[in-house]
Amino acid sequence: MKQYNDLFKIIHREGYIFIASFALVSFLLASFNEKLGCIGCIATAWCIYFFRNPDRFVPISDDLVISPADGIIQEIKEALPPPELGLGDVEMIRVSIFLNIFNVHVNRIPANGKILALHYNPGKFFNASLDKASIYNERQSVLMETAQGQKIVFVQIAGLIARRIVCDLEEGNEVKTGERYGIIRFGSRVDVYLPLKTALLVSKGQTAIGGETIIADFGRKKTTEFKFERK
């Protein structure tokens, strides 16, 4: 029984219906044409790969902000946070992480703290690699207060192909760094907004690993010690 539970654990539940559908179509195609059946099996295997949900070794410290997603650090700039969160016209550092269709799409909590507000904003579906995607695309914005009292924002953004954002958080949730909280299907972007004086530990073009890569350290001016936990 444990083996079956472990199997389902490594696949995100959002993928179950897709995998089952692909497998059924593959079976039907194979009954008519062997080559079509092979193509269907390849598509099913890719679907399983897309919805993979691997464990990560998460650095644990109240000072740290970790990447909420796998992908490329596409942009780091000063920008206003999503207006729907009511933070006013105070610019923050925005770290944008672009996910292609081959990245793990499960999203993770970037820091220890409490969820203060959530807001879903329906929008367009521009290519998530474009700067305007942060403003105009469909998004799910989350405001949290870290254990150190810092307010940070993380935003799931739909892309050209991604048409489904899943966020399992609720206002008032106490959350831990690296916990899984949602997924964006089929290519997307995640933005993280941090206070302007935050010490960043990533650079543009760097590959980020969700739940592992340290984006920033609020205690950078002092020696920060932390441990790792598998999640």
From Swiss-Prot:
GO molecular function (one): phosphatidylserine decarboxylase activity
PTM annotation (Pyruvic acid (Ser)): residues: S188
Catalytic reaction annotation: a 1,2-diacyl-sn-glycero-3-phospho-L-serine + H(+) = a 1,2-diacyl-sn-glycero-3-phosphoethanolamine + CO2
Top enzyme category: lyase
Protein's cellular compartments: Cell membrane
A GO cellular component annotation in the UniProt record: plasma membrane
Keywords per UniProt: Cell membrane, Decarboxylase, Lipid biosynthesis, Lipid metabolism, Lyase, Membrane, Phospholipid biosynthesis, Phospholipid metabolism, Pyruvate, Zymogen
Active site: S188
Membrane topology term: Peripheral membrane protein
Cofactor(s) listed: pyruvate
InterPro entries: PS_Dcarbxylase, PSD-A
EC number per UniProt: 4.1.1.65
Pfam families hit by this protein: PS_Dcarbxylase
Residues forming coiled coils: none
Processing after translation: Is synthesized initially as an inactive proenzyme. Formation of the active enzyme involves a self-maturation process in which the active site pyruvoyl group is generated from an internal serine residue via an autocatalytic post-translational modification. Two non-identical subunits are generated from the proenzyme in this reaction, and the pyruvate is formed at the N-terminus of the alpha chain, which is derived from the carboxyl end of the proenzyme.
Pathways per UniProt: Phospholipid metabolism; phosphatidylethanolamine biosynthesis; phosphatidylethanolamine from CDP-diacylglycerol: step 2/2
Similarity section: Belongs to the phosphatidylserine decarboxylase family. PSD-A subfamily.
Subunit structure: Heterodimer of a large membrane-associated beta subunit and a small pyruvoyl-containing alpha subunit.
Protein name in the entry: Phosphatidylserine decarboxylase proenzyme
Gene: psd
